[in-house]
């Protein structure tokens, strides 16, 4: 049987959306319960949010043919999704909110749309970095920082293994200072 176009596919999409929304909502509820002094209730909300995340992941995998795609494919899908959000979705929502007199909400849709555009550009740059072999290696020396222990290495490439904590190259990034 073909899942594409079936009622079951539609149900999987609804289940994924519902579980994803519930996870976020319960995370917000956990934060509020913690602020209100209810540690146990916060923990229960957080545990439930974690359960909902796993449910969403299960439905997502079924929609994707049983697996989460490669990082490069995921970056491309993410860039495409962000493009839709800023070029179509938020643009339409901004116009509709204005027509209905919700000027502040229209403004928020516009501003979030600008953020989504930045997200798309960031994903496209990461795609370019993977395609050009620039994630862990650059022309000229760079300051590489281990995200696990904070060890600093200066060179054209991140080390294969962190000499301090033994974590793999995957934990290194170019050190950014914005302070």
State where each predicted segment sits.
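Non-heme di-metal
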Residues: 1-179
């Amino acid at each position: 049987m073909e899942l594409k176009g079936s009622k079951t596919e539609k149900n999987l999409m609804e289940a994924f959306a519902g579980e994803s929304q519930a996870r976020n909502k319960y995370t917000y509820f956990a934060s509020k319960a913690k602020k209100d002094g209810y540690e146990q209730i916060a923990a229960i909300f957080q545990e439930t949010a974690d359960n909902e995340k796993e449910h969403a992941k299960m439905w997502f995998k079924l929609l994707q043919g049983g697996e989460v795609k490669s990082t490069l494919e995921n970056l491309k899908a993410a860039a495409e999704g962000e493009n839709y959000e800023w070029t179509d979705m938020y643009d339409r929502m901004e116009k509709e909110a204005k027509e209905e007199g919700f000027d502040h909400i229209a403004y928020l849709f516009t501003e979030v749309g600008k953020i989504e555009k930045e997200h798309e550009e960031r994903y496209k740059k990461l795609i370019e970095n993977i395609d050009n072999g620039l994630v862990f290696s650059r022309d000229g020396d760079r300051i590489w920082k281990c995200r696990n222990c904070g060890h600093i290495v200066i060179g054209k490439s991140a080390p294969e293994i962190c000499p301090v904590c033994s974590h793999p190259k995957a934990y290194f990034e170019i050190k950014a200072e914005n302070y």
